[in-house]
């Protein structure tokens, strides 16, 4: 979908939320539940983070991933409560261990139903007593807990900061930039408004700002640029695509931990470079590169196709050396720093 969707921004945000609420099929062991979670994230990808967070806290796949099914009154499991605050909504240092214990009580009773791909609240397993969370006291349950957490000023800064980190730069935004982004996020917690605000920031297009593309984003962009739809490939080629992503260390629905995938230089290892080269060769082998082949300046033509404004002298020299073979040229261009690292 990332390679073929008419609205790639929505698919990119769906991918972002998959990494943010990182859930692995390895433990969930239900493709149906993983697909249902993916649909939920797509539905809310560009909407209100409130709606997304409310849906995710009782998402069946996430419940199984973070031991929600074993969270019951009298014997709470703290895993979901802790990760929801630390990794999904607040960040480290903005809650206490007491908050985790009390939040776990608020989330008791929710169980994933594999047969219906839904979650339901089992009243006899829910702790309906008074809880003390983040300085507030009340009979908190799942949805009221979410609203309480998202109402903290730290939450807006955290969520906006994560969007910036994954979409713009590993360097945090300046204080004035962060304030503008938080203002755009607003009380509605509007993801689309934040994205508009991000793209309006000078830093978004500053050549000094760079971000190493995640393998899945790199491959999806390459498939889209070269006009290759994964669904049109034969089984062997699709298997090779998946093997290539595995070699790069990023397979959808199989994040290494609840913290999601690595970022930045972690994707620039020697082994990753070899895997990227093989993937680029595979995609180029199925691409229609007629326009590049006919161009007098093939390096510029492939740059236009990939959305690269300019090649460095070093990359130009490398491209010149393979200009006689348009598929080899495309492979080298796809693995060049100017494409692997967006700036």
Q: Predicted segments — roles?
A:
Residues 152, 156-192, 196-343:
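Flexible, low-complexity segments enriched for small/polar residues
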Residues 4, 22, 68-71, 147, ...:
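A ubiquitous short alpha-helical element
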